[in-house]
Regions:
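Short, surface-exposed connector motifs at secondary-structure boundaries
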Residues: 93-100, 205-207, 234-236
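Well-ordered beta-strand positions
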Residues: 179, 204-205
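Nucleotide-state-sensitive switch-loop elements of NTP-binding domains
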Residues: 37-63, 67-73, 81, 90-178, ...
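Hydrophobic positions on the alpha1 helix immediately C-terminal to the Walker A/P-loop
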Residues: 86
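Canonical P-loop GTPase G-domain recognition
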Residues: 214-261
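Histidine-centered metal-binding segments
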Residues: 1-42
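G-domain G4 guanine-recognition motif of GTPases
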Residues: 78-79, 104, 185-186, 206-219, ...
Length: 261
């Protein structure tokens, strides 16, 4: 029995405590004494099928976006990092410059965030994941595909998927986005890129938010940047305050460039 493991290159295998080989190269020297869980062939088969079906749906989403000339951004973060506040300011800017935006708003329960975003001229579709035990902690490609059915893709330039607030799971599931970004609040500390590397590694853009709180916190911005560089040296980093608007101009220019490509 072993531990199921999925890598950034989307290959999968189990660790059984013995030597193993597979089609991609990476080092396990840094695995340390991680807790493992027992799996059997049935569990592995189910996980492989889930990822395979999701990846097929993600490819279909990307094809639909390409057909309609839509750039898709997957926006992720922990709960409370400031995604929705950032989106409010971003949508207001996009409305001013004539970029036609749509939002897929993911939350376990309520329409609170979707209601907040509805006043900025964007098409907004709500995805509540609360059915089942506690609700899904992420959006996946089939969910997004279903939500996109409620949008007029042909009238959009940009689709933003605001994923469910969670620092791990959303990064595991390809939703068909062209760009992945995350909002990271300085209240979360400097060490999270090292402790929870999956999302940081998966993102093209990291928006370091709540910079207006920096004078009141013992947050070392350079240490955070160094930790981030260890897991993702090529991520584009913006230091912003969604509350005050500081730093957002550079982010807006970057986003506009992505949409126009």
């Amino acid at each position: 029995m072993g531990r199921f493991h999925r890598h950034d290159d989307r290959t999968e295998h189990t660790h059984d405590g013995q030597e193993h080989s597979h089609s991609h190269s990476h080092s396990h020297e840094d695995l340390g004494d991680h807790a493992s869980y027992e799996t059997g062939p049935e569990r592995i088969s189910v996980l492989e099928r889930i990822f395979s079906e999701n990846d097929a749906a993600a490819d279909a989403n990307r094809a639909a976006f390409a057909e309609n000339g839509v750039h898709c951004l997957n926006l992720m973060s922990s709960p409370g990092a400031g995604k929705t506040t950032l989106l409010e300011r971003t949508l207001a800017h996009l409305q001013e410059i004539g970029v036609r935006a749509g939002i897929v708003e993911g939350d376990i329960e309520t329409s609170i965030d979707a209601d907040r975003l509805a006043g900025y001229g964007a098409q907004v579709v709500l995805l509540n994941t609360g059915d089942g035990f506690g609700g899904e902690c992420h959006l996946d490609a089939p969910m997004v595909r279903k939500a996109v059915g409620g949008l007029d893709l042909g009238s959009l330039d940009l689709l933003i998927v605001e994923n469910v607030g969670n620092l791990v799971c959303p990064a595991e599931f390809d939703v068909g986005a062209h760009t992945s970004a995350m909002v990271y609040a300085i209240t979360e500390g400097e060490e999270k890129p090292l402790k929870y590397p999956v999302m940081f590694r998966a993102c093209d853009v990291v928006l370091v938010n709540k910079l207006d709180l920096l004078p009141h916190l013992d947050f070392d911005l350079e240490l955070f940047r160094g930790n981030l560089a260890q897991v993702n040296p090529v991520a584009v980093v913006f230091e912003v305050s969604a509350r005050t608007g500081d730093g957002l101009q550079a982010w807006h220019e970057h986003l506009t460039t992505m949409v126009s490509v």
